[in-house]
Amino acid sequence: MAGAELIGNEEMKEVMDVLETGVFMRYGFDKERQGIFKVKQFEEEFAQYCGSTYALGVTSGSSALKVALAAMGVGPGDEVIVPAFTFVATWEAVLEVGAIPVMGDIDAT
């Protein structure tokens, strides 16, 4: 499988650390977590890498689009220009924050 060669002992250990706690949620269960906060650690390191104060790990690109729109203050009644040829998540994220997707294209033909 393509990409499998990139998974080595270090990656396996990181995953096993989480699996061994039995806690698969981002928040809560601090005692059971045994001091293992992989997502929080990633968010902090990624924010620092990007020169940002905040970063938020999410479950998918769809979630990332929705979070980005909300972070920019996009909401009900706002119009957001989206590509006419794209994956449906682009439009769904706009609709989920209550905004109106406006299809745009780069070629009049």
Where are these regions (language model features)?
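Conserved PLP-binding active-site segment in aminotransferase class I/II-type PLP enzymes
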Residues: 1-70, 75, 97
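PLP-dependent aminotransferase-like
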Residues: 70-109
